[in-house]
Amino acid sequence: ISAPQREFLTSDAKYIYCQGGYGSGKTIIACVKAILLTVAIPGNRGVVIRESYPKLHDSTQRTFMECLDRAHIRYKGRENRDGWYHRLIIPVKGGSSEVFFRETKNLGRFLGSEFGWWLVDEALEVDKDVFKKLQGRLRLPAARGHYAGMLVSNPPHLNHWLHEVFGEEPRSFSVEVAIQGEIELSTFRYMQVSTRQNPHNPPGYLADLLTGLTQAEIDRLVEGQYGYIPDGPPVYPMFEHHRHVGLPTLP
């Protein structure tokens, strides 16, 4: 695995957000970590979240199921809709664990009361309210001491709630909360990953991705940095410093 993937996998932060460019390997390592938490803790319960079921089925859940198959992990499927299981029961040593797959629509209605981990893929597509609801359900007794709230996403715009919660620069930090005279800590980790850091992309992938992109688009879609996301066709071409700024022509 790549160095950023190893960092994500070994982080003990309660809430970890990985923001990365296309093909940076963020979704697959989040699925691997979710599976490890599922099989290592008997009775654990987790949920994989995406903005809609079509996106969940076509991308995130497909990756999750491929990881299970590669690891030769057996499971029993439940809640079959549209050819996809939305609940898995995974036999583990000492019992079994569960994994749910949900879209954000009517999330409160379909979420269980308690989870040991959750994973939100493409978090830029969901509202902050989803994050708050999931925070309130990260309390499964079986997973005490090993809770994990995971978010992965392509870079959102600068005024997105992810920027508000996790900050502008990659960092680890904690938030202190006073409860009945005692201080409790919530730990956070924000990672930023570039497409260039994934050695497993096919030959030519990065070159194809870079073709035709402006520097601002490269910063966001390749380097994984926050940036402006245009909506609709531009009235004027996007500003590029190297193209539109220069020395004046002297007479």
Please provide the spans of the model-predicted regions:
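Pre-Walker A adenine-sensing motif
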Residues: 1-13
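Conserved RecA-like ASCE P-loop NTPase motor core of nucleic-acid helicases/translocases
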Residues: 44-56
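Walker A/P-loop NTP-binding motif
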Residues: 27-42
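Walker B catalytic acidic pair
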Residues: 121-122
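Inter-Walker segment of RecA-like/P-loop motor cores
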Residues: 54-116, 226
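Short hydrophobic/aromatic beta-strand immediately N-terminal to the Walker A/P-loop
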Residues: 16-19, 47
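ATPase catalytic-site recognition across NTP-hydrolyzing enzymes
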Residues: 198-251
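ASCE P-loop NTPase helicase motor core
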Residues: 125-204, 208
